[in-house]
Every structure is written in structure tokens, then in C-alpha cells.
Curated annotation (Swiss-Prot):
Similarity remark: Belongs to the bacterial ribosomal protein bL21 family.
Gene source species: Rhodopseudomonas palustris (strain ATCC BAA-98 / CGA009)
Protein name in the entry: Large ribosomal subunit protein bL21
UniProt gene name: rplU
Subunit note: Contacts protein L20. Part of the 50S ribosomal subunit.
InterPro entries: bL21-like (IPR028909), bL21-like_sf (IPR036164), Ribosomal_bL21 (IPR001787)
Length: 126
């Protein structure tokens, strides 16, 4: 099953376990958020929204908040000794799609446990 969601003015085709970068969304790292603007639900019987599918949401886990690559806006007016250089970086949220939900269901998957490096075994040294 797949879904087409809209967030930040852009549309994304997602399936469970997809990892995608979207514009900044409020939410703590490791928390589960719900994306409510589902435009299409695909599968055996596709459902098209008008404009959105009623009762459908997509659950996603927030993996990270970061900044995108720097975009340089350079303007020069020839023969006028005038120029302007500005830089800009987008705020990005990295999401992992956990579930695609229909009919107003709630997410059943909680946040995943963080992986930690195992401490070296003291018994092995003996």
C-alpha cells in the first residue's frame, strides 16, 4: 500500500519504512507524528481524495532535524559597481514512515528504541 501526502507545499509518494527529508516539522527526535493531508491511497482499490482522503493519515517517526545545503543568491549589476551575495539554508526534518492508516485509525507503532553501543564485556578480558 502506498500514499501520496502533502507537507510543506510539496507532495511525496510514500510506503511504510520510507525515509524522506521534508521541510521543518515540529516534533522531538524519536516521537511519532501524524501527517493528515493524504491525497491518494493506493493498493488493491485506490482511493482519490477530493482534495484529501477523509479519515486517512500517515504515521511517521522523526529521525533528525538538520539544515540543508547552502544556496547562494548572487546578484550583480554590470558596469554599476553593485553586487549582492546572500546565503540561505533550509531547515529539514528527516522522517521514517511507520504506517499508512485509513478510516480514522490510530498509530499502533510507538517510537523505536534508540540503539546504543554495547559496553565491552569485562568478563572477556579475564
Amino acid at each position: 500500500m502506498f500514499a501520496v501526502i502533502k507537507t510543506g507545499g510539496r507532495q511525496y509518494r510514500v510506503v511504510p519504512e520510507d525515509v524522506l527529508e521534508v521541510g521543518k516539522i515540529d516534533g522531538d527526535v524519536g516521537s511519532i507524528i501524524q501527517l493528515g493531508e493524504v491525497l491518494v491511497l493506493g493498493g488493491d482499490t485506490p482511493v482519490l481524495g477530493a482534495p484529501t482522503v477523509a479519515g486517512a493519515t500517515v504515521a511517521a517517526e522523526v529521525l533528525d532535524h538538520k539544515r540543508g545545503p547552502k544556496v547562494i543568491a548572487f546578484k550583480k549589476r554590470r558596469r554599476k559597481h553593485s553586487k549582492r551575495k546572500r546565503g540561505y539554508r533550509d531547515e529539514i526534518t528527516v522522517l521514517r514512515i511507520t504506517e499508512i492508516l485509513a478510516d480514522g485509525k490510530k498509530p499502533s507503532v510507538g517510537p523505536r528504541a534508540k540503539r546504543t553501543k554495547a559496553a565491552p564485556a569485562a568478563e572477556a578480558a579475564e
